[in-house]
Swiss-Prot record:
Pfam families: Ribosomal_L13
GO biological process, one term: translation
Species this protein is from: Xanthomonas campestris pv. campestris (strain ATCC 33913 / DSM 3586 / NCPPB 528 / LMG 568 / P 25)
Listed name of the protein: Large ribosomal subunit protein uL13
Keywords: Ribonucleoprotein, Ribosomal protein
PANTHER family on file: LARGE RIBOSOMAL SUBUNIT PROTEIN UL13M, RIBOSOMAL PROTEIN L13
Length: 142
């Protein structure tokens, strides 16, 4: 008997639609990262991308607990001296709400080429509309 190893060309990848309205940021992000990796499947193999495609809608309606809206900070550096930009979660949700979920999920995925291919299967939209109707995503309740 040999150990089963999934092959990336034979993995069945499904499309799922997730509504983020009223969901907690961290709890939603962990489940999204788990499904992007494919850990929910019996054919999960750590070195093969076995995850599904995820379409997240209503990213602007995400909620956080405690004082994180004011206390949580996002930093980015432009590359120029003295240009470390900092914004709170509240400001980030106003400017680009989809990026908040993307950053949270990306930090939970592996760092490297495999993690980047997993991350590309995540599609986040701030409103209720998305351009992936042709893929017929199944509604996933998280």
């Amino acid at each position: 008997m040999t150990t089963f190893t999934a092959k990336s060309e034979t993995v069945q990848r499904d499309w799922y639609l997730v509504d983020a309205a009223g969901k907690t940021l961290g709890r939603l992000s962990t489940e999204l990262a788990r499904r992007l990796r494919g850990k929910h499947k019996p054919v999960y193999t750590p070195h093969v991308d076995t995850g599904d495609y995820l379409v997240v809608i209503n990213a602007e309606k995400i909620v956080v607990t405690g004082n994180k809206l004011k206390d949580k900070k996002y930093h980015r550096f432009t590359g120029y001296i003295g240009n470390l930009k900092t914004e709170s979660l509240e400001q980030a949700l106003q400017r680009h709400p989809e990026r908040v979920i993307e950053i949270a999920v990306k930090g939970m995925l592996p760092k490297g080429p495999l993690g980047r291919t997993m991350y590309r299967k995540l599609k986040v939209y701030s409103g209720a509309e998305h351009p992936h109707a042709a893929q017929q995503p199944q509604v996933l309740d998280i």
